[in-house]
């Protein structure tokens, strides 16, 4: 086991605070509409230019071990805030730095760190309660666009795209962000349920100009096993042919004589069919087939429920208004499933989301909810260069997460004003002792910091602006984009309540841990030069006694 080095008391805290400041100073220059860019080096390829706080934080590793511990703790603030709310990482970092900086002064002066932390926690709890009181629900597309615009650093086109996407697919719909292939941003919306499996043979194509197989008013056969023997399929094929409707087959696989017979019948015009593989694998495949069955009003033909292909009837088949099958995707439009059954299925999946332990599982379950309840929109981010597209894509991701947070918990006035307004609720608090009172005052001072940083990044005098905003009431604040004072809600400067709340709670949590730290244990440097004995004159590179 490698040797460890231990640092105690003020020496440990001072080093940790240095690390906090190094990371926070690099991140906070990006805050606000006039925030600056940060350039990140890449081992391979072009450097990345970004205004995304969490992207900057994730890149930082410091050479000094103890400083790096401090930096990593603040990085955790940014990451946790990003995971929970999707935005507000820079605000969280600025708040954490402010609480640590003010708290360190009190600890150095001999106050009890644990009482300071209790005071900080009490003040933050009061601030969160007040934030919830001043929060207002998002009701209009305009408000959604404004929230997205602010989070995208004032780019209105991004805000409008996201608002349009939510309008099209609903609040339950999935919105994904991809690299575009043109200079302009594009929005693609998929109606109905789409899964990533295409036709098993190009001979099913009946729209050659679009390379699609399109079926109008088809029956839909869902099977969880491979189909290779045509005799298994014949009874149901005959029933579908008599009904004079096309057929979509979704199975684990369709191969051999079964596939060949379907292709021949399709070419001859005897029965219009398309066969595709079922999406997913294992248990997820079964769940997705069941989703499709509920959406189309059919049943999955599976031995588990006692159903077999040979005995399948039209009653077990699903229906849809239209099906479009491409090389890689299948889209079911306007399935014939009953709404109560679909709603019950959505409720069941939501319960699974609440219990999911991994982000991957949660994401896949959320996709299933969206496909059943809403739709899927894809925002394709355009730009002249790869670097520009990457930077813009980061901002679109932030804006998208901020919008979801606003829909979830509502909105408060932006530009750091909401945190100024909650100070009144904290100022009335009484601590159990003088040290707790000092902890409350730490939070009171820290709540001004995001506004101070926004103003400083805009090149204005922070103290003057903070005093002017504090003298106002309600939504009155400073719009750094225009350099004017006024009603921020009316001018569209909004923040999601969830983002502001999460940033404050996470910042206070990590800052409290740093202030109550009294020792650090870290790996000793491996190639540290031998320390010269005290009192030897001229000890250095030239050796004892030599003076250069």
UniProtKB/Swiss-Prot annotation:
It holds the Pfam family Cpn60_TCP1. Residues 524-548 are annotated as: Disordered. Keywords: ATP-binding, Chaperone, Cytoplasm, Isomerase, Nucleotide-binding. InterPro entries: Chaperonin_Cpn60_CS, Cpn60/GroEL, Cpn60/GroEL/TCP-1, GroEL-like_apical_dom_sf, GROEL-like_equatorial_sf, TCP-1-like_intermed_sf. Disulfide bonds: none annotated. Gene3D superfamilies: GroEL (3.50.7.10), GroEL-like equatorial domain (1.10.560.10), TCP-1-like chaperonin intermediate domain (3.30.260.10). GO terms for biological process: protein refolding. It is found in: Cytoplasm. GO terms for cellular component: cytoplasm. It catalyses: ATP + H2O + a folded polypeptide = ADP + phosphate + an unfolded polypeptide. CDD domains: GroEL. The keyword Ubl conjugation does not apply. ATP binds at residues 30-33, 51, 87-91, 415, 479-481, 495. One of its GO terms (molecular function) is ATP binding. Residues 537-548 have a biased composition (Gly residues). Its main location: cytoplasm. Forms a cylinder of 14 subunits composed of two heptameric rings stacked back-to-back. Interacts with the co-chaperonin GroES. Together with its co-chaperonin GroES, plays an essential role in assisting protein folding. The GroEL-GroES system forms a nano-cage that allows encapsulation of the non-native substrate proteins and provides a physical environment optimized to promote and accelerate protein folding. HAMAP family: CH60. PANTHER family: 60 KDA HEAT SHOCK PROTEIN, MITOCHONDRIAL. Belongs to the chaperonin (HSP60) family. This is Chaperonin GroEL 2.
């Amino acid at each position: 086991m490698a040797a460890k080095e231990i640092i105690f008391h003020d020496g440990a805290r001072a080093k940790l605070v240095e690390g906090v400041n190094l990371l926070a100073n690099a991140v906070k220059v990006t805050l606000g509409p006039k925030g600056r860019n940060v350039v990140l080096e890449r081992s391979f390829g072009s450097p990345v230019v970004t205004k995304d706080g969490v992207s900057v934080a994730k890149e930082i590793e410091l050479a000094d071990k103890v400083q790096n511990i401090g930096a990593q703790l603040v990085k955790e603030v940014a990451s946790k805030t990003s995971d929970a709310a999707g935005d507000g990482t820079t605000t969280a970092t600025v708040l954490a730095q402010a609480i640590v900086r003010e708290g360190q002064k009190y600890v150095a002066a001999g106050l009890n760190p644990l009482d300071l932390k209790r005071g900080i926690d009490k003040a933050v709890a009061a601030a969160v309660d007040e934030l919830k009181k001043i929060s207002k629900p998002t009701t209009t597309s305009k408000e959604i666009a404004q929230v997205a615009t602010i989070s995208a650093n004032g780019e209105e086109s991004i805000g409008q795209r996201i608002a349009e996407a939510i309008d099209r697919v609903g609040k339950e719909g999935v919105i994904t962000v991809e690299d575009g292939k043109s200079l302009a941003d594009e929005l693609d919306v998929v109606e109905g349920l789409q899964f990533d499996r295409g036709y098993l043979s190009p001979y099913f194509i009946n729209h050659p100009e679009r390379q699609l197989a399109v079926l109008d008013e088809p029956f839909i056969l869902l099977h969880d096993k491979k189909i290779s023997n045509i005799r298994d399929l014949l009874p149901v094929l005959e029933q579908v042919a008599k009904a004079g409707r096309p057929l979509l087959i979704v199975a684990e696989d369709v191969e051999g004589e079964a596939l060949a017979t379907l292709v021949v019948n399709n070419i001859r015009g005897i029965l219009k069919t398309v066969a595709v593989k079922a999406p997913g694998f294992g248990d997820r495949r079964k769940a997705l087939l069941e989703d499709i069955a509920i959406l189309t009003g059919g049943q999955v033909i599976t031995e588990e429920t006692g159903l077999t292909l040979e005995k399948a009837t039209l009653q077990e088949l699903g229906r849809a208004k239209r099906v479009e099958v491409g090389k890689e995707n299948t889209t079911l439009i306007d399935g014939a499933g009953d709404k109560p059954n679909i709603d019950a299925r959505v409720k069941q999946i939501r319960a699974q989301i609440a219990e999911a332990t991994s982000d991957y599982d949660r994401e896949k379950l959320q996709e299933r909810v969206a496909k059943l309840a809403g739709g899927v929109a894809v925002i394709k981010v355009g730009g002249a260069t790869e670097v520009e597209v990457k930077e813009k894509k980061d901002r679109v991701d932030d804006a998208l997460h901020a919008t979801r947070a606003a829909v979830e918990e509502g909105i408060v006035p932006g530009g750091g004003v909401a945190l100024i307004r909650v100070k009144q609720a904290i100022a009335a608090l009484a601590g159990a002792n003088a040290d707790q009172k000092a902890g409350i005052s730490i939070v009171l001072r820290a709540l001004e910091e995001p506004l101070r940083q926004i103003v400083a990044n805009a090149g204005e005098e922070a103290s003057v602006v903070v005093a002017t905003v504090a003298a106002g009431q309600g939504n009155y604040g400073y719009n750094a984009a225009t350099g004017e004072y006024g009603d921020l809600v009316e001018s569209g400067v909004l923040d999601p309540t969830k983002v502001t709340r999460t940033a404050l709670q996470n910042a206070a949590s990590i800052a409290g841990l740093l202030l109550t730290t009294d020792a650090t244990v870290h790996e000793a440097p491996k190639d540290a030069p031998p320390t010269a004995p005290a009192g030897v004159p001229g000890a250095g590179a030239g050796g004892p006694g030599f003076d250069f």
